[in-house]
């Protein structure tokens, strides 16, 4: 990004007002929460946040995070019949009630998912940490409701308060905020073709700071960088 800015200045290329910003906390989902949009001074923007060369991305997941806490009842295993509630077993029962075909490893395209990111527990207490994703806000709400329904069922089975579900929204699909400013996409298409590539437009199976910026009043689609295998051990990007 800075090399591009340097080139524009050094070569005296004609341009309008350009605003450049860097957000430090994108990977924890808080990179744009406190971004000073009025101070930034732009009417529109693009993020450069991963994706294949030629990618133009203006539709992303709606996202939420869920924490499931299970409270068990521990007694001596030798006299546990009809008394013990093993929190770890209830945690497995909760996870087993979620659809197997709605996991990251079984979905693609516009299919949303429940992703179990972490779990730990013992007889007394267990916790499950999930992220929930869907391009369709109504389908994401269904996933939230489904988790609460499972908790209600298990509380009916094991006793009130056994399972607690806490859900927090993370970010929303930017599409609704980009549609009224679709010249951003037309301009990006033209730029990609001028660079000798063909634009590729697919819904992002993830999120970007541009989504938060768009909802906060700065319409901001994403441009691909030519990188691959993000968030994996084989992550790489082009050097050109």
What are the language-model segments listed below?
Residues 1-26, 66-70, 76-77, 81-101, ...:
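Alpha-helical metal-binding/catalytic segments enriched in His/Glu/Asp
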Residues 122, 198-240:
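Zn-dependent metallopeptidase/amidohydrolase metal-coordination segment
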Residues 112-120, 131-136, 162-182, 205, ...:
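A short beta-alpha structural unit
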Residues 57-63, 119-124, 212-217:
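Short glycine/proline-enriched loop/turn "hinge" motifs that connect secondary-structure elements
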Residues 18-19, 43-46, 66-67, 200, ...:
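Structural motif
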Residues 2-59, 103, 111-117, 121, ...:
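Acidic/histidine-rich catalytic neighborhood of metal-dependent amide-processing enzymes
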Residues 58, 80-119, 138-164:
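Acidic-enriched catalytic cores of C-N bond-cleaving enzymes acting on peptides and small amides
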Residues 74-75, 132-140:
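A generic structural motif
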């Amino acid at each position: 990004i800075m090399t591009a800015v340097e080139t524009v200045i050094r070569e005296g290329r004609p341009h309008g007002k350009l605003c450049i910003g860097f957000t430090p906390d994108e990977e924890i989902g808080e990179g744009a929460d406190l971004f000073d949009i009025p101070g930034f001074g732009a009417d529109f923007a693009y993020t450069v946040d991963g994706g294949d060369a030629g990618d133009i991305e203006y539709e992303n997941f709606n996202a939420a995070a869920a924490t499931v806490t299970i409270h068990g009842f521990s007694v001596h295993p030798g006299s546990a019949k009809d008394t013990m509630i093993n929190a770890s077993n209830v945690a497995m029962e909760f996870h087993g009630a979620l659809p197997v075909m709605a996991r990251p490893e079984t979905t693609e395209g516009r299919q949303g998912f429940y992703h179990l990111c972490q779990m730990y527990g013992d007889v007394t207490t267990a916790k499950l940490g999930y992220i929930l994703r869907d391009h369709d806000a109504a389908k994401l709400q269904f996933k939230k409701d489904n988790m609460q329904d499972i908790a209600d069922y298990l509380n009916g089975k094991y006793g009130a308060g056994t399972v607690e579900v806490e859900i927090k929204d993370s970010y929303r699909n930017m599409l609704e905020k980009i549609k009224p400013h679709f010249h951003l996409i037309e301009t990006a298409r033209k730029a990609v073709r001028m660079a000798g590539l063909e634009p590729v437009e697919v819904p992002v199976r993830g999120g970007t700071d541009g989504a938060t910026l768009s909802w906060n009043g700065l319409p901001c689609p994403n441009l691909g960088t030519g990188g691959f295998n993000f968030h994996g051990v084989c992550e790489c990007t082009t050097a050109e």
